[in-house]
Amino acid sequence: MNVFINAEVYNDLISYSLRRLPEEACGFILGGQDSGNGELQTSTFIPLRNIASNPWNRFEISPVEMLPYLMDSNHPVIGLFHSHPTAPPLPSEQDLQTLWHSIPTYWILSLQQPQRPELQLYQIKKAPQTAYHKLAFVIGQ
C-alpha cells in the first residue's frame, strides 16, 4: 500500500505537533483510495485533543471528539496520527497494543530534532499476533 500525502496535510501535522510540544500531538488523517491504482490519498489533517493523564509520552483521544469523524462515511479516516516528542518514529509497545488496527494507516512523527521532523507510516495487524510494517509514502503538492 502506498500513500500520497498532500503538502498541506504534511505541513499541518508538523506545525500542530510543534505547537503541542512537549506533549504528544494526535489526530486523524482523512482521505480516500484512488480507484485506479489503489493508493491512499490524504485530504485533511484533523487535530484532536490529547486527553491522556500523561500526555508527554502517550496519547488518548476523547471518544466524544472522535466519534463524528469515525461515523462520517463521506470523509473516511484513513490514518491515525500521533507524535513522539523525544523518541524515534517507531511504534512503541503501547502503540502496538492499539485498538486502532482497523484504520488503514498509523502515522508517527518524531520530533527528537524539532528542526528536522521525521515521519513514518505503518500498517498494524493484530491477528494472529501483532505485527507492523512500514508503508511507502510520497509528499506532493
List each model region and its residues.
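Conserved beta-strand-loop surface patch within small alpha/beta domains used
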Residues: 1-77, 86-141
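Conserved, mostly hydrophobic/aromatic
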Residues: 80
